UniProtKB/Swiss-Prot annotation:
Gene source species: Escherichia fergusonii (strain ATCC 35469 / DSM 13698 / CCUG 18766 / IAM 14443 / JCM 21226 / LMG 7866 / NBRC 102419 / NCTC 12128 / CDC 0568-73)
Binding locations of Mn(2+): 213, 232, 269
Post-translational modification N6-acetyllysine, affected residues: 87, 523
Coiled-coil intervals, chain numbering: none
Name assigned to this protein: Phosphoenolpyruvate carboxykinase (ATP)
Record CDD domains: PEPCK_ATP
Pfam families xref list: PEPCK_ATP (PF01293)
Amino acid sequence: MRVNKSLTPQDLMAYGINDVQDIVYNPSYDLLFQEELDPNLKGYERGVLTNLGAVAVDTGVFTGRSPKDKYIVRDDTTRDTFWWADKGKGKNDNKPLSPETWQHLKGLVTNQLSGKRLFVVDAFCGANADTRLSVRFITEVAWQAHFVKNMFIRPTDEELVDFEPDFIVMNGAKCTNPQWKEQGLNSENFVAFNLTERMQLIGGTWYGGEMKKGMFSMMNYLLPLKGIASMHCSANVGEKGDVAVFFGLSGTGKTTLSTDPKRRLIGDDEHGWDDDGVFNFEGGCYAKTIKLSKEAEPEIYNAIRRDALLENVTVREDGTIDFDDGSKTENTRVSYPIYHIDNIVKPVSKAGHATKVIFLTADAFGVLPPVSRLTADQTQYHFLSGFTAKLAGTERGITEPTPTFSACFGAAFLSLHPTQYAEVLVKRMQAAGAQAYLVNTGWNGTGKRISIKDTRAIIDAILNGSLDNAETFTLPMFNLAIPTELPGVDTKILDPRNTYASSEQWQEKAETLAKLFIDNFDKYTDTPAGAALVEAGPKL
């Protein structure tokens, strides 16, 4: 069998990259390990070996995505379909870019990559062969090649024989755009997409997550237009084949809660839902490591070994890691191939239709209950609201928990109007007879975060059906159905009012939060379907 290892400099000339010295094509993990630790490397290119066997790298100034530097070329392909930042009521990061400015940025990146020794990784985004993207990543930095090898689906030798990329990602992290002011851009850094050319360009930021979330944004454009749900969620499957999906923004518990020794992991962040069921977009996991401990999260801790890649953690002189140190960023991370988790769906990361849909929120106000069972209209309302507290460090400039509303629990990655995702999800849920729940992994009136132990017991009660059979009462103002008791959960925390010195204190905070919900949802009331959902939200 002949594997296409003969990618040549001529192949890269088609993208505008010239005079390439050498191409390291689909490097092995062993080769990447050597490359990352090369003592001749300088600055952010150079990795450090930790006592756990994983290499740690520093992503520079950018320790999270830079949404203000995200652009989409507005042309005939995207003009009438994309959810644009400069149109309508919704707030998003999809800023339009002219084809002329795109060509300038492309010239900067191709000039940066020309004449260099390059790493090229061919991989898939999407576990379903019918709808996956074949993506070619081009970078001059070994650890960035390692990151995409971890995070995307690694092709077999057979699949590489006739691999033809649908999408090209050119990472020019070392170059910046000096003409940004004249071009009306946000800064010298850029993360730009062209749907006509099927290409992503990166300049100025070293953060690996831009490649991961960039391809997620593209799947979020392509799949819903085919009637396939594209979801910012984790997913797992039980022994009886029962599938659960966990929606939530960064830091709300998607990775932690879906990594469950009693269930097999489908994936931890990005999934589709088609006629056959739920499938992963990725071939790896990207877990937060701040305050990580072997006791609280053994599966994730044990996944940090050779071939895992740590980002922005503090490594002591003896190679040990201080997971409690957030001085560089609270958004410390590790990427690892999904098979570093023992209990995964094999050989392909997909399963049947979901019957449990869990919305994770981290409520900084301490108003919402740890768990509530949603009606069909409440499901749509809370999906479109996407409320959480924005947690420290996943974006630049955010260091304290602040409340935020992110449509579909992932507005930063949406390419179409949020209602299109809600419509597709609801159709899939109705066909599967799925039930939705709102789970608060954040804070309560004590000012303490709800414990992982209690949250895990709540998830168990959802998955084993005991929550559906529990007696419930209704929380005023938010009209949420709350169980009176659940196995293994401290009954006192189920009603958030009980965690305050007085119910008046809860009432005061609840009114503040309810008003935020109502004001946020106003942007959906310009359609009859959106206006009809107002009744499912909080009432003052």
